[in-house]
Amino acid sequence: MNRRHFLQTSAGAALTSCSTFSEPDALIIDTHQHLWDRGVISPPWVKGAPEVLRHDFVTADYVKANAGLNVKAIYMEVDVAPKDHVKEADDIVAQCRAGNTPTIAATIGGRPASEDFETYVKRYAGNGIVKGLSQVLHGDSTPQGFCLSPEFVRGVRTLGKHGLNFELTMRPTELKDAAKLIKECPETRFVLDHCGNGDPKAFNPKLGPGLKRSCTVDEWKRGIDAVAASRADVMCKISGIVAFVPPGKWHAEDLAPVVNHCLDTFGPDRVFFGGDWPVCLLGSPVRGWVDALKQIVASRPARDQRKLWSGNAIRFYGLKV
């Protein structure tokens, strides 16, 4: 589909079925909000990140970035050093309890394979704010297949035992491992973050070279299909992919193949939106990502769009909004 046809069909569909989400007061649940104040906790990776991310990003900045949108957010851990996990989690829980922030819940960081993991989990289980946990699995220091190690599987099972979910942030080449992990942990609910790290540049090489951890389009699609089929309650977070494209050189249709495959494979009841701010700034301000996604889904039924933007997240995370 060429860009002109994409824009024409999207615009026409928007007039017939998407007016709800062109209104500024339509609720958006951002399931993937990052915050860091280096005076409190400094994620180690920030020092080597692109310059746009080598700053503090606090609630006031998030509010400014989302001006004009009716947003409530779920904090997403920022890959701090393990020694700072408790400090990070305690800080965001305190912010949520203060009630003066759009952040209403949290996915905290942790190490499921650690010996004291259950003690850590018990500290936050049942507090009403912490909904789950994640560990970044696509870093160079994490070996391939790590998520299937006995210690890791044991830890992820522990989350389900205490009513918490696990969010999968991993290499697209290992999505079939994710499907195996899900089957090994039947009592734990899962979210696949960032569309399984699908890279839009794999669909359109004109956008530039793909990431070193990228895979072929067919391999990524098979991985997404495997995760979706692994269990009927696995969710997919439509997030992260705008960070892969060059700023100012992409259009909504460049993201559409990744988004649409995830939406079609998981179905309208198993997807929700994530802003990935401020990491999204590698490709776009968060408003640019929101506008692009609205355009991509414009032809879908309004009820499905409501599920994507807010309804599914409210249900899955048990949010009170």
Positions of predicted regions on the chain:
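Mid-to-C-terminal alpha-helical segments outside catalytic/metal-binding sites
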Residues: 3-21, 26-31, 40-41, 47-68, ...
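Histidine-centered catalytic micro-motifs
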Residues: 28-38, 192-195
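Short, electropositive alpha-helical surface patch
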Residues: 83-102, 186-192, 251-264, 289-296
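Active-site gating/metal-coordination segments in enzymes
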Residues: 86-174, 180-183, 196, 214-215
